[in-house]
Amino acid sequence: MTADLLPVRRALLSVSDKTGLVELATALAARGVELLSTGGTAKAIRDAGLAVKDVADVTGFPEMMDGRVKTLHPMVHGGLLGRSGLDDAVMAEHGIGAIDLLVLNLYPFESVTAKADCSLADAVENIDIGGPAMLRSAAKNFARVAVATDPSQYAELLASLEANNGQLTAATRFAFSVAAFNRVAQYDAAISNYLSAVTATDTAVPVRAEYPAQMNSTFVKVMDLRYGENPHQSGAFYRDLYPVPGTLATFQQLQGKELSYNNLADADAAWECVRQFDAPACVIVKHANPCGVAVGAGNGDAYELAYATDPTSAFGGIIAFNKPLDAATAKVILDRQFVEVLIAPDYEPAALEYAQKKANVRVLRIPHGDGLNNFDNKRVGSGLLLQSSDNRGMTRDELKVVSKLAPTDKQFTDLLFAWKVAKFVKSNAIVYAKDNRTIGVGAGQMSRVYSARIAGIKAADANLVVEGSVMASDAFFPFRDGIDAAAAAGIKAVIQPGGSMRDAEVIAAADEHGLAMVFTGVRHFRH
């Protein structure tokens, strides 16, 4: 049975990150807590004018082997592992004093090995041995011992001591124990991933494989979801341990119903697409496919143009902006259509106030960030597919004109716009665009020519004029039929990767129809 409240009389502090150390030690000393410490931590505490006992004086052994051995001793681990009422006699027999609180963070292995010029020797020297051992001992004995692993926990620790007259609750000790075991697992995973990636050690800086022989990943649960992709499936949302700034996992929900599995999948597609653009842009997504994308003079202009691409599909969609959302645009959207999720880097106060009239609409703020996801993964039966993220951009200078007719400057602008959109449309993907807006989108067809036909049908349904538009294809055209369909619809320029066995036939079709065509040399499959 675990006692609910236990006093803290003796604490061991040993940290590599000195953030908040002196303030914590001062607060503990003010409560009469005896402080034990090691090396640089003890020096920092002494320099603050506080009394502290060196662990070497407790163990009777000096720190040795350049600090590799200092806490691996029964006087330390016995003090952490000793059980009240069970081990009291043994501890008294051997003069082991109980340690009630351990404050410890580990050598900075992750940050050291993140440096491109990190040597294997530096990596190895930053593998903490005594630290994880103490964390495990203290965390295992949460019935009597509390353990803090990060400066972010110090405020909660001190608040709990203050609220309970120098004692810590069982709930606090257990929560800190779980955090400690999680930290040790993360640390060991980082070491395993690093060493598993090392393929050569005969150079000053070891050669590391992009994909380690064994991979360990850590994710933190953000929330449980009402259900998964379908109501009969359960679901939850987890984020990376260290989310990339500017990505979906950094969102703040400002209002609305609980987010669903599909909401989050669609929101990610919409946000990643819209954040490609520098000018004000709007992306409307349905079932993870953009159904309308536009760049405009402002949010309102971009939204109107994106919405006009496919008003039917926009119903119940996810709408994302790359600029702070103004009240006027928010009012137009919410008065016109049913929206599942609104996304923007920020909102005018009046926009949020108006959104409250539609309390079920989920409103997300995702702060701007320049970071990009490095890897994508997909689960398959008992396995994982891992790849580098498709972050490949494209500039005009990289395009190769393969037709007799070269695109005009305006067509080049539209081609690059359509190419950005096509990257986020499920394959086979065809995008018709003109004047920095989508005219029609053909997505997810098994035949590329059918995607081209669907893009034309979508444009006609929305009463949009295809004549003079450009077409983007996420992959090469295996036959000329896609070009024939595009020309019949009124397309005047085409951007595609090239690389088909029938490229000559496809180029000839473009020349026959008087189309300009450029190759990117880059494919954007999306499944």
From Swiss-Prot:
GO CC annotation terms, alphabetical: cytosol
InterPro entries: AICAR_Tfase_dup_dom_sf (IPR024051), Cytidine_deaminase-like (IPR016193), MGS-like_dom (IPR011607), MGS-like_dom_sf (IPR036914), PurH-like (IPR002695)
Annotated protein name in UniProt: Bifunctional purine biosynthesis protein PurH
Reaction(s) catalysed by this chain's protein: (6R)-10-formyltetrahydrofolate + 5-amino-1-(5-phospho-beta-D-ribosyl)imidazole-4-carboxamide = 5-formamido-1-(5-phospho-D-ribosyl)imidazole-4-carboxamide + (6S)-5,6,7,8-tetrahydrofolate; IMP + H2O = 5-formamido-1-(5-phospho-D-ribosyl)imidazole-4-carboxamide
Pathway linked to the protein: Purine metabolism; IMP biosynthesis via de novo pathway; 5-formamido-1-(5-phospho-D-ribosyl)imidazole-4-carboxamide from 5-amino-1-(5-phospho-D-ribosyl)imidazole-4-carboxamide (10-formyl THF route): step 1/1; Purine metabolism; IMP biosynthesis via de novo pathway; IMP from 5-formamido-1-(5-phospho-D-ribosyl)imidazole-4-carboxamide: step 1/1
GO MF entries: IMP cyclohydrolase activity; phosphoribosylaminoimidazolecarboxamide formyltransferase activity
Keywords: Hydrolase, Multifunctional enzyme, Purine biosynthesis, Transferase
Gene: purH
Tagged with keyword Transcription: no
Species, as recorded: Stenotrophomonas maltophilia (strain R551-3)
